[in-house]
Amino acid sequence: MNPKLQLSADNAYYHIRNAITTGKILPGERVITQQIATELSLSRTPIKEALARAEADGMVVRAGNWGYTVREITLRDAENIFEARMVVELACAQIAADNSNASDHEEMTRLWSKAHAAFDKGRLSDFLLASRQLHGFIAKCTGNNILLNLFNQVNNLVLLFALSLLRANPKRAAEIDAENKALIEAIKQKDKDLAGRLIRSQVVRAYEMYHQTLTNNQSNRIIKLKELVS
């Protein structure tokens, strides 16, 4: 792929990813290639490349011969995602506590401040994305590209339903904000055991919130996240 086409495909991918993670395109809904091409003033070719990448990331699925839809998360999917998140993010936090430096800590604090500002303004979507960006940077601080790639793979799936769950449980944002601040402090102090405990607690709390949301919506088979957005 030539550099210009690659750049267009990259831009299209992040546009699609943002539309999915912010709830502009909901689980089960069709991703319309021509609409995205028009929005970005691009041909259909880079859009198709972007959708193939999103499919590889698990964010969209093929829908017969007429394109792609946003992936719907089953109960089994969600259980697997939480399990993978526990393993990957716990490892990232503990290794980052050993490997990160003062410059890294400054960047973590900057990202936390970005998320905190969004939280203060009630912008849940921006808060969530900044929070996940912080965790992505922590993964980067491990210095382990394989672990970083695993984080990104799991994170793409987390983002498929995290915003809908947060909107259904908005008080959880304050808890996440405080948890992230405590996590940064543990990493600064190179306390890998505390960092691990904080991640474990955060993921367990998210898992409990997920099941509470299922209970509240009287579903135990498939989580129809489009029903939770309103």
Listing of model-derived features with the role each one plays in the protein:
Residues 1-94, 98, 211-230:
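Short linear motifs at protein or domain termini
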Residues 7, 106, 171-175:
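Short helix-capping and inter-helix turn/linker motifs at the boundaries of alpha-helical repeat units
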Residues 19, 23, 154-161, 165, ...:
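A short secondary-structure junction motif
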Residues 56-61, 152-157, 171-174:
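Mobile beta-alpha loop/short-helix "lid" or hinge segments that flank ligand
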Residues 81, 102-163, 177-186, 194-206:
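Conserved amphipathic alpha-helical segments that form helical-bundle/coiled-coil interaction surfaces
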Residues 97-98, 143, 167:
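Short helix-capping/hinge motifs at transmembrane helix termini and TM-loop junctions
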Residues 172-230:
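C-terminal regulatory/effector modules of DNA-binding transcriptional regulators
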